Amino acid sequence: MGPVVERPAEPGTSSAAELELLKRRAAERIDEAAERLGALSRAIWSAPELAYEEHRAHGELTRFFECEPPAASWAVQPHFGLPTAFRAEWAPPESAAGPRALQVAFLCEYDALPALGHACGHNLIAEVGVAAALGLRAALESIAAPPPVKVIVLGTPAEEDGGGKIDLIEAGAFENLDVVFMAHPSQENAAYLPDVAEHDVTVKYYGKASHAAAYPWEGVNALDAAVLAYTNLSVLRQQMKPTWRVHGIIKNGGVKPNIIPSYSELVYYFRAPSMKELQVLTKKAEDCFRAAALATGCTVDIESEAHDYYNVIPNKTLCSAYTENGKKLGMEFISEDAVLNGPSGSTDFGNVSFVVPGIHPYFYIGTDALNHTEQYTEAAGSQAAQLYTLRTAKALAMTALDVIFKPALLEGVRKEFKCKLQEEQLLNTAA
């Protein structure tokens, strides 16, 4: 994956006072649409769908843009690259938008978790993306001669499993985008968190069934291999870096106690701060899996998922602009020390951050409940979350306006993106 082709960093200019008026108009438009936006979020929340199966959410989101007045003002492409992805685009008719137009994109997620529903608040991610796009459009519409800009919303399914954004990158959906924005619900406000790289595997052991009481010596125990593998990885933790994470389950351990299991299956996730470190960790783990097969006489298949999630490359220039706008709206952000020493996860936005500069902040939704719990599911569907969600959308829209009307900021965003991408490439190719 390579970076996008850039256009000149001069889409528009505006005085500080004029820019503040545009930001105010963006916030006003989001408030005006609050009821519709909340209804959209609740519709997605009330009918949770798993990765690549978000058909109802896809329909709700595309209909929202198709029905946004005036009629047909958004160019909507359903099933964009994936059955449950979409693209909505708007450009000021007076701006002579063309190939040189600055393309600003807001990303929506809307897949849920098995059994828990929207325990990661992806309904709120979708709402933030839609709301920010509406706010930015309203601000640009208030200008007599708006600059050449395209406002794009990308519906990106399957973040929880599979990596829909990676599919869309491969399909060309991120080509020619200049800056991308999205925001993720959490327990605090942070312009970024150190999201790490992730590699997932399914490990299958094949043995030989036998009667466990009458002639166990005739069997080859695949469950023993799974247990040994689990133990091997537990011992490996002594030599793991503090920033590495390994977690897994035994998905299949046999069918009946008096039958020597002929098959077992584990699923493991490996995480590390960089793709380079992730490769080292993965090699160590695979050695553990193969050693368990050797010790038990089983055969083993190690199947990697189709996509690895890259670590997120933060753009501090963009983060600073977002933080400034957020503080004006009353957001309180955690400290840099808390960011660096706090919890982290993985996201397919990491892969996006290697292709186009962007921002992936986290936002408080009025609860201390942790993501991926029943309590967070409840909070993500609550009315209390709406204030914080729409406030975040306003901050994103305001930051997008900064990018559009401050050429020096856009140039800084691009320069930092290039430098950090080169650093990552050097890190990942170093011996």
From Swiss-Prot:
Reactions catalysed, as given in the entry: beta-alanyl-L-lysine + H2O = beta-alanine + L-lysine; beta-alanyl-L-arginine + H2O = beta-alanine + L-arginine; beta-alanyl-L-ornithine + H2O = beta-alanine + L-ornithine; N(2)-(4-aminobutanoyl)-L-lysine + H2O = 4-aminobutanoate + L-lysine
Molecular function terms, GO-annotated: carboxypeptidase activity; dipeptidase activity; identical protein binding
Domain of life, source organism: Eukaryota
Keywords: Carboxypeptidase, Hydrolase, Protease
Its EC number(s): 3.4.13.4
GO cellular component: nucleoplasm
Any one GO BP annotation for this protein: regulation of protein metabolic process
Pfam family, one: Peptidase_M20
Function description: Catalyzes the peptide bond hydrolysis in dipeptides having basic amino acids lysine, ornithine or arginine at C-terminus. Postulated to function in a metabolite repair mechanism by eliminating alternate dipeptide by-products formed during carnosine synthesis.
Family: Belongs to the peptidase M20A family.
Cross-referenced NCBIfam families: amidohydrolases
Protein name as it appears in the record: Xaa-Arg dipeptidase
Organism encoding this protein: Mus musculus
